[in-house]
Amino acid sequence: LIFVSLPRISNESSMTQDNSIVIREYLTTDKEVVMNLIKLNTPNFFAKEEVNDLSNYLDKEIELYYVLLVDGKVVGCGGINFAEKRTIGKISWDIMHPDYQGKSLGKKLLRYRIEVLKAIPSIKKITVRTSQLAYKFYEKQGFTLNEIKRNYWADGFDMYSMQYNEL
């Protein structure tokens, strides 16, 4: 076990001040809404084959996973996994409700997880594997493209392997 002091989340966002934004750890009771989020983003951002992959991840592979709530409603989620004796932090399974995309909430959730990883002394590298549909988002947040594997996730869904530059 590793204990990390988690960064505080402010309520600042590009949304109106009436909106309360909270990031908290995923609970198993969140699974249904998280699964609905991926379905809402399929096939625009995820291949249909990935829906079952996410379910398996939530049941068996989850390490750190968070949900983002606006006014008490889960509208986004994303995780962290570890590799190479916890020296690599891997950003995983970022999903945002389509109605809440483009409002800086995905950026807020990503930044939160980057801060969590920066607070872990053993972390030397932060990576993400995404697709051609979302890699520009990570590029804007300080990630650099390292490799592309065509049709990796599914037919027409390439894998873009990226690394965070500001660690």
Where do the language-model regions lie?
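Conserved acetyl-CoA-binding loop-helix of GNAT-fold acetyltransferases
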Residues: 96, 102-115
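Conserved GNAT acetyl-CoA-binding A-motif
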Residues: 117-130
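Helix-loop element at the rim of GNAT/NAT acetyltransferase active sites that forms part
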Residues: 25, 35-49
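Active-site rim helix/loop that mediates acceptor-substrate recognition in acyltransferases
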Residues: 44-66, 70, 79
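A conserved beta-turn-beta hairpin within the catalytic core of GNAT-like acetyltransferases
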Residues: 82-92, 101, 120-122, 156-158
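A short beta-loop-alpha structural element at the N-terminal edge
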Residues: 20-34
